[in-house]
């Protein structure tokens, strides 16, 4: 009986020492904010190419995911659902289909997103 208690005690000590070993994990956090419906690199209001868009961010995120793999965290900080006709179409015209924004965020594998003040304007 003493031997069993001793073995379990040694196993417990071994398990605790292994758990206490320090492990460094390198994370990459990519955050978007104030996208304002700029899902494509084109401004549908001015009819010109647009420098910022989720499409361009996706290209950047793909490269970063190659290096960081599952250690990349992709977040959005809100104000993404208004600003361009592509967003307004799903906000007011086609309210039954999945919203283009949610489709793009799912495709890009966002880990989380929160609402900004402009995101509640559509109701």
Q: Model regions: which residues?
A:
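Positively charged n-region of N-terminal signal peptides that target proteins for export
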Residues: 1-4
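Bacterial N-terminal signal peptides
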Residues: 8-15
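Sec/Tat signal peptide C-region and signal peptidase I cleavage site
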Residues: 16-20
